Amino acid sequence: EKVVRYDFHKYSIENWSKGGISCKTFYETGRFAGILKRIRKNDYVIIALQHNDKKPDVGEKVADYKHYLTYFTQHIQRKGGKVIFMTTPPKNYADRKTFKIYVPEYRNAMLQVAKDLKCNYIDLSKLSTDYFNFRGKNYVNTLYMKLNPGQYPAWEQGINDDTHFQRDGAKVLARIIAVDLQANRQIPMLN
């Protein structure tokens, strides 16, 4: 998968994510090396790896997860970059009426690495879980890829995806992130 680039007035954003990737596979596939080649002093790197790190086929144990996060951060900082960690939103399980933080042990590990390495973070796990519980299941179902047959041509049979978001869901998450970034005055680019 390619890197997606967005250019705004004085900012350029590159999205190096890839579906199904964990910290380990992000490193092993060379995606992290690609980021390191492009980093310049004072660049920000948002690390949001968590959802796939528990999967047995691509993931790793919590200790290994912390190792990769630490490795990534130290190498980014050596190049003059700044890391912002971001925990991931909850899953939307059909059999649950409320939302819970997904893989809390990995969330806690990420927050611990952020604290240990004095990095900023966005706790999207907590922020989105709280917001989703406030708004309720019916509303939140419209944000995830829970599509009826025929609703979209690409998914003629429908889809019941409890992890990924539709465009409206992505916009809600972007608003939650933007509000948190604006409230977090420790990040100089936002002052």
Q: Can you say where each PLM-predicted feature lies in the sequence?
A:
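Serine-esterase "nucleophile elbow" of acetyl-processing enzymes
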Residues: 1-17, 33-41
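Extended interaction regions within the primary functional domain
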Residues: 3, 8-12, 25-29, 84, ...
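Short, solvent-exposed coil/turn linker segments
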Residues: 7, 21-22, 123
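Acidic/histidine-rich helix-loop elements
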Residues: 15-26, 55-60
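Alpha-helical cap/lid subdomain in secreted, periplasmic
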Residues: 30-171, 175-191
